Amino acid sequence: MVASPHIAHFFVTALQQRCSVITNPANGETVIIDGGGDSDRIIQWIDSGIGQADDEIGSFEGERKVVALINTHAHFDHSGHIPYLKEHYSLEWWLHEDDFFLQSLAQESGRRWGFSLPEPAVAENTWKHGEVHTFADMEFEIIHTPGHTLGGCCLRLIVDDGPDHLFAGDTLFQGSIGRTDLPNSGGDLELLLRMIRERLWPLDEDTIVHPGHGPLTTIGQEKRTNPFLNDGFRGRG
Protein backbone atom coordinates (compact mmCIF):
# COMPACT_ATOMS: atom_id res chain seq x y z
CA MET A 1 0.00 0.00 0.00
CA VAL A 2 0.99 3.61 -0.40
CA ALA A 3 0.52 6.65 1.79
CA SER A 4 -0.78 9.86 0.21
CA PRO A 5 0.02 9.24 -3.47
CA HIS A 6 0.45 12.23 -5.73
CA ILE A 7 -1.98 12.05 -8.65
CA ALA A 8 -1.79 14.41 -11.62
CA HIS A 9 -4.42 14.50 -14.35
CA PHE A 10 -3.88 15.54 -17.95
CA PHE A 11 -6.93 15.90 -20.18
CA VAL A 12 -5.67 14.81 -23.57
CA THR A 13 -6.97 14.90 -27.15
CA ALA A 14 -10.07 16.76 -28.27
CA LEU A 15 -12.07 14.10 -26.42
CA GLN A 16 -10.59 15.29 -23.10
CA GLN A 17 -9.57 11.84 -21.96
CA ARG A 18 -8.06 11.69 -18.48
CA CYS A 19 -4.47 10.48 -18.38
CA SER A 20 -3.41 9.90 -14.78
CA VAL A 21 0.19 10.18 -13.60
CA ILE A 22 0.59 8.63 -10.14
CA THR A 23 3.73 9.10 -8.07
CA ASN A 24 4.73 7.28 -4.90
CA PRO A 25 6.03 10.10 -2.68
CA ALA A 26 8.33 7.70 -0.85
CA ASN A 27 10.54 7.02 -3.85
CA GLY A 28 9.43 9.18 -6.79
CA GLU A 29 8.50 6.13 -8.85
CA THR A 30 5.63 6.90 -11.19
CA VAL A 31 2.90 5.07 -13.11
CA ILE A 32 1.08 6.40 -16.18
CA ILE A 33 -2.49 5.24 -16.73
CA ASP A 34 -4.16 5.67 -20.14
CA GLY A 35 -1.54 7.57 -22.13
CA GLY A 36 -3.83 8.50 -24.97
CA GLY A 37 -2.34 11.78 -26.16
CA ASP A 38 -0.23 14.87 -25.45
CA SER A 39 2.77 12.67 -24.72
CA ASP A 40 5.27 15.50 -25.34
CA ARG A 41 3.56 17.65 -22.73
CA ILE A 42 3.36 14.82 -20.21
CA ILE A 43 6.97 13.75 -20.73
CA GLN A 44 8.21 17.32 -20.33
CA TRP A 45 6.25 17.75 -17.09
CA ILE A 46 7.49 14.43 -15.66
CA ASP A 47 11.11 14.70 -16.75
CA SER A 48 11.75 18.43 -16.39
CA GLY A 49 8.94 19.87 -14.28
CA ILE A 50 7.99 22.20 -17.12
CA GLY A 51 4.33 23.08 -17.55
CA GLN A 52 1.36 22.16 -15.42
CA ALA A 53 -0.99 19.27 -14.95
CA ASP A 54 -4.67 20.05 -15.40
CA ASP A 55 -5.30 19.16 -11.78
CA GLU A 56 -3.48 17.44 -8.94
CA ILE A 57 -4.25 15.52 -5.76
CA GLY A 58 -1.61 15.57 -3.05
CA SER A 59 1.86 17.03 -3.33
CA PHE A 60 5.31 15.87 -4.37
CA GLU A 61 8.60 17.72 -4.72
CA GLY A 62 11.37 15.76 -6.35
CA GLU A 63 12.41 13.80 -9.39
CA ARG A 64 10.06 11.28 -10.93
CA LYS A 65 10.98 7.97 -12.53
CA VAL A 66 8.34 6.32 -14.71
CA VAL A 67 8.30 2.57 -14.05
CA ALA A 68 5.00 1.38 -15.56
CA LEU A 69 2.57 2.08 -18.40
CA ILE A 70 -0.86 0.58 -17.73
CA ASN A 71 -4.27 0.93 -19.34
CA THR A 72 -7.91 0.55 -18.41
CA HIS A 73 -8.74 -0.36 -22.02
CA ALA A 74 -7.40 0.04 -25.55
CA HIS A 75 -9.61 2.60 -27.30
CA PHE A 76 -7.43 5.04 -29.24
CA ASP A 77 -8.11 8.05 -27.00
CA HIS A 78 -6.70 6.06 -24.07
CA SER A 79 -3.84 4.31 -25.87
CA GLY A 80 -2.94 6.42 -28.91
CA HIS A 81 0.34 7.81 -27.52
CA ILE A 82 1.47 4.66 -25.74
CA PRO A 83 3.99 4.01 -28.57
CA TYR A 84 5.73 7.32 -27.81
CA LEU A 85 5.72 6.70 -24.06
CA LYS A 86 7.02 3.14 -24.49
CA GLU A 87 9.88 4.35 -26.65
CA HIS A 88 10.83 7.29 -24.44
CA TYR A 89 10.80 5.37 -21.15
CA SER A 90 11.85 1.96 -22.56
CA LEU A 91 8.98 0.24 -20.80
CA GLU A 92 6.59 -2.59 -21.52
CA TRP A 93 2.83 -2.03 -21.52
CA TRP A 94 0.09 -3.66 -19.45
CA LEU A 95 -3.43 -4.28 -20.81
CA HIS A 96 -6.14 -6.91 -20.35
CA GLU A 97 -5.73 -9.56 -23.05
CA ASP A 98 -9.38 -9.31 -24.14
CA ASP A 99 -8.55 -5.86 -25.53
CA PHE A 100 -5.44 -6.96 -27.41
CA PHE A 101 -7.43 -7.07 -30.67
CA LEU A 102 -8.29 -3.37 -30.27
CA GLN A 103 -4.62 -2.39 -30.39
CA SER A 104 -4.44 -2.99 -34.13
CA LEU A 105 -7.54 -0.83 -34.67
CA ALA A 106 -6.34 2.24 -32.76
CA GLN A 107 -4.75 4.05 -35.69
CA GLU A 108 -7.71 3.45 -38.00
CA SER A 109 -10.23 4.37 -35.29
CA GLY A 110 -8.36 7.57 -34.52
CA ARG A 111 -8.29 8.53 -38.19
CA ARG A 112 -12.08 8.26 -38.37
CA TRP A 113 -12.25 10.81 -35.55
CA GLY A 114 -9.74 13.10 -37.22
CA PHE A 115 -6.64 12.10 -35.22
CA SER A 116 -3.24 11.25 -36.65
CA LEU A 117 -1.68 8.49 -34.55
CA PRO A 118 1.50 6.42 -34.74
CA GLU A 119 1.58 2.74 -35.51
CA PRO A 120 -0.24 0.98 -32.65
CA ALA A 121 1.66 -0.32 -29.67
CA VAL A 122 1.68 -3.97 -28.66
CA ALA A 123 1.04 -4.88 -25.04
CA GLU A 124 3.61 -7.29 -23.63
CA ASN A 125 1.80 -7.97 -20.36
CA THR A 126 -1.70 -8.77 -19.22
CA TRP A 127 -3.61 -9.44 -16.02
CA LYS A 128 -6.75 -11.13 -14.74
CA HIS A 129 -9.68 -10.06 -12.60
CA GLY A 130 -8.91 -10.01 -8.90
CA GLU A 131 -5.14 -9.93 -9.24
CA VAL A 132 -3.15 -7.34 -7.31
CA HIS A 133 -0.13 -5.96 -9.14
CA THR A 134 2.59 -3.83 -7.59
CA PHE A 135 3.97 -0.92 -9.60
CA ALA A 136 6.22 1.73 -8.02
CA ASP A 137 5.69 0.00 -4.67
CA MET A 138 1.97 0.78 -5.01
CA GLU A 139 -0.68 -1.94 -5.11
CA PHE A 140 -3.34 -1.94 -7.82
CA GLU A 141 -6.27 -4.37 -7.75
CA ILE A 142 -7.46 -5.36 -11.22
CA ILE A 143 -11.25 -5.25 -11.55
CA HIS A 144 -12.36 -6.58 -14.93
CA THR A 145 -15.52 -4.73 -15.98
CA PRO A 146 -16.35 -5.72 -19.58
CA GLY A 147 -19.23 -4.00 -21.32
CA HIS A 148 -17.66 -0.88 -22.80
CA THR A 149 -14.95 -3.09 -24.28
CA LEU A 150 -14.29 -6.79 -23.80
CA GLY A 151 -11.15 -6.16 -21.77
CA GLY A 152 -12.14 -3.00 -19.96
CA CYS A 153 -10.85 -2.84 -16.39
CA CYS A 154 -11.00 -0.55 -13.39
CA LEU A 155 -7.75 -0.22 -11.45
CA ARG A 156 -8.06 0.27 -7.68
CA LEU A 157 -5.08 1.95 -6.04
CA ILE A 158 -4.97 0.71 -2.45
CA VAL A 159 -4.13 3.54 -0.03
CA ASP A 160 -3.25 2.99 3.62
CA ASP A 161 -4.00 6.46 5.03
CA GLY A 162 -7.12 7.55 3.20
CA PRO A 163 -9.71 6.54 0.62
CA ASP A 164 -8.68 4.27 -2.23
CA HIS A 165 -8.61 5.58 -5.81
CA LEU A 166 -10.44 3.82 -8.65
CA PHE A 167 -9.22 4.55 -12.17
CA ALA A 168 -12.41 3.63 -13.96
CA GLY A 169 -11.60 4.22 -17.61
CA ASP A 170 -14.86 4.37 -19.55
CA THR A 171 -16.77 2.02 -17.26
CA LEU A 172 -18.28 4.54 -14.83
CA PHE A 173 -18.64 8.32 -14.98
CA GLN A 174 -20.20 10.92 -12.75
CA GLY A 175 -23.90 10.39 -13.46
CA SER A 176 -23.31 8.12 -16.43
CA ILE A 177 -21.71 4.94 -17.76
CA GLY A 178 -19.56 4.00 -20.74
CA ARG A 179 -20.99 3.69 -24.22
CA THR A 180 -21.76 0.20 -25.42
CA ASP A 181 -22.53 1.01 -29.07
CA LEU A 182 -19.02 1.69 -30.38
CA PRO A 183 -18.04 -0.53 -33.33
CA ASN A 184 -15.63 -3.45 -32.97
CA SER A 185 -15.49 -3.13 -29.18
CA GLY A 186 -17.67 -5.93 -27.86
CA GLY A 187 -20.04 -3.53 -26.13
CA ASP A 188 -22.79 -5.04 -24.00
CA LEU A 189 -25.03 -2.77 -21.93
CA GLU A 190 -26.54 -5.44 -19.69
CA LEU A 191 -23.09 -6.85 -18.95
CA LEU A 192 -21.68 -3.41 -18.14
CA LEU A 193 -24.48 -2.66 -15.70
CA ARG A 194 -24.06 -6.05 -14.03
CA MET A 195 -20.30 -5.62 -13.70
CA ILE A 196 -20.72 -2.22 -12.07
CA ARG A 197 -23.27 -3.54 -9.59
CA GLU A 198 -21.38 -6.74 -8.80
CA ARG A 199 -17.78 -5.53 -8.84
CA LEU A 200 -17.78 -1.79 -8.10
CA TRP A 201 -20.69 -1.27 -5.71
CA PRO A 202 -19.08 -3.48 -2.99
CA LEU A 203 -16.10 -1.08 -2.80
CA ASP A 204 -15.92 1.41 0.06
CA GLU A 205 -18.32 4.27 -0.59
CA ASP A 206 -15.58 6.87 -0.08
CA THR A 207 -13.49 5.36 -2.89
CA ILE A 208 -12.58 8.21 -5.23
CA VAL A 209 -13.49 7.45 -8.84
CA HIS A 210 -11.29 8.87 -11.60
CA PRO A 211 -13.38 8.42 -14.78
CA GLY A 212 -11.85 8.41 -18.23
CA HIS A 213 -13.75 11.63 -18.99
CA GLY A 214 -15.41 14.25 -16.83
CA PRO A 215 -15.23 15.13 -13.13
CA LEU A 216 -14.23 12.94 -10.22
CA THR A 217 -16.88 11.23 -8.15
CA THR A 218 -17.15 8.54 -5.47
CA ILE A 219 -18.63 5.07 -5.36
CA GLY A 220 -21.14 6.24 -2.76
CA GLN A 221 -22.32 9.17 -4.84
CA GLU A 222 -22.84 7.00 -7.91
CA LYS A 223 -24.67 4.32 -5.95
CA ARG A 224 -27.09 6.97 -4.73
CA THR A 225 -27.53 9.16 -7.79
CA ASN A 226 -26.40 7.54 -11.05
CA PRO A 227 -29.57 7.27 -13.15
CA PHE A 228 -28.25 4.36 -15.21
CA LEU A 229 -27.81 2.20 -12.12
CA ASN A 230 -31.07 2.79 -10.31
CA ASP A 231 -33.78 0.17 -10.18
CA GLY A 232 -35.82 1.85 -12.87
CA PHE A 233 -33.17 1.47 -15.55
CA ARG A 234 -32.58 -2.02 -16.86
CA GLY A 235 -30.98 -1.16 -20.16
CA ARG A 236 -31.07 -3.27 -23.25
CA GLY A 237 -28.55 -5.50 -24.98
Question: Where do the protein language model's features map onto the residues?
Answer:
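Short Pro/Gly-enriched beta-strand edge/turn motifs at strand-loop
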Residues: 1-6, 111-115, 136-140
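Conserved beta-strand hairpin/beta-sheet module of binuclear metal-dependent hydrolase folds
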Residues: 2-51, 62, 155-169
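Conserved beta-strand segments of alpha/beta enzyme cores
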Residues: 6-8, 92, 125, 139-141, ...
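Short Gly/Pro-enriched turn/cap motifs at secondary-structure boundaries
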Residues: 10-12, 122-124, 144-148
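Short catalytic-loop micro-motif centered on adjacent basic/acidic residues
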Residues: 29-33, 68-71, 142-144
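Hydrophobic residues in well-ordered beta-strands that form the structural core
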Residues: 33, 94-95, 168, 211
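Active-site HxH/HxHxD metal-binding segment of metal-dependent hydrolases
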Residues: 38-41, 47-135, 163-164, 224-234
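Metallo-beta-lactamase
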Residues: 54-63, 109, 132, 138-144, ...
